[in-house]
């Protein structure tokens, strides 16, 4: 006990071992759904689901463990929602790249991320991007997740006349997915920990009776990670056509992870002005996890906002994160259950997370059209072009041009001009996806 006290400085942070254990369990329950959702999404890109399941558990455990031991922060890491969907449905299925090349793009973005963190450039870049565009990126990814989830559940379907139309509302997947979404929202409103996880499991159990799904068991030895381990194609990812993908991964990773880390740390009272040493360690842990995740075989890893649930339960140190890491390692034994989860069981989770991401709309300045219009264009272009990259491109270009045309070019940070120019060059000479 004394060793734990000394390592995590529990007394200094006003917490106890018991409180940290409860906080760790709380955080885990709120984000454990990722071990089911991530293999489902990346599996649609042709990746071996069992191997992705192992990679997801391992990188969540490794990244969170480093966060706890190195930064002493009660923050958990795992493959991020949104970027996994972009990886699977846009980069691989839409743009035609292999998943190995997509992993290579994640690796390169992770290296860039690590470099800007080591050289303390991250804060400079973050400050250079307008707050409205940062908020719009979150909203756009939320809408992107929504359209993917509705399609996975069968609630919407393709239509040559109207582009999209209503699916078969009498089919078991649609009924079960709708029920799962209502369960998640209800449990969340009642402040039940693990609402998303419970919703996924309930729909999965019902699918055995009403959805024609087969039960493969619950516990077994972990499957092999060999099909995805070190399978990334870095050389192909360095080609010009993948620059667009790398830029998207890099920008979203940076905004999402930095915002989450600072938000949760602030809520825990760990963000002290002028003392950024621990935060910089947390940023390094986050950057390193992206790098390692691509080697194991999963999309970009990020800090989870669900960590706030553990902070709310009293978590204040890295011991909370260590507990989460141990629980993710334990998940390696439930691979048969993960393989039994159908796409329409994870669809409600995607839709719920997507809905929550729309809350950033309230942060937009609706009185200034040079701010809100680029934000709206960014958010709307993502689902309607089925591409996060296009949303970013249209948003940055629109922002720069509107400020220029209205005589407010001086308000535009140099970083915006650079990113807008890169996207313009890409559209003019490479084409768009």
Task: Give the label of every model feature segment.
Residues 46-65:
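Loop-to-helix transition at the N-terminal end of transmembrane alpha-helices
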Residues 2-38, 59, 80-138, 266-361:
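Helix-loop-helix junctions within the multi-pass membrane cores of secondary transporters/permeases
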Residues 1-51, 164-166, 197-280, 424-425:
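Helix-loop-helix hairpins and the membrane-proximal interhelical loops
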Residues 25-32, 62-65, 69, 150, ...:
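Hydrophobic/aromatic residues within the transmembrane alpha-helices of Major Facilitator Superfamily
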Residues 40-52, 90-101, 242-243, 342, ...:
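Helix-coil boundary and interhelical linker segments in multi-pass alpha-helical membrane proteins
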Residues 95-209, 322-433:
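Membrane-embedded alpha-helical modules
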Residues 60-81, 112:
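Juxtamembrane transmembrane-helix boundary signature
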Residues 40, 65, 69, 90, ...:
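Membrane-interface helix caps of multi-pass small-molecule transporters
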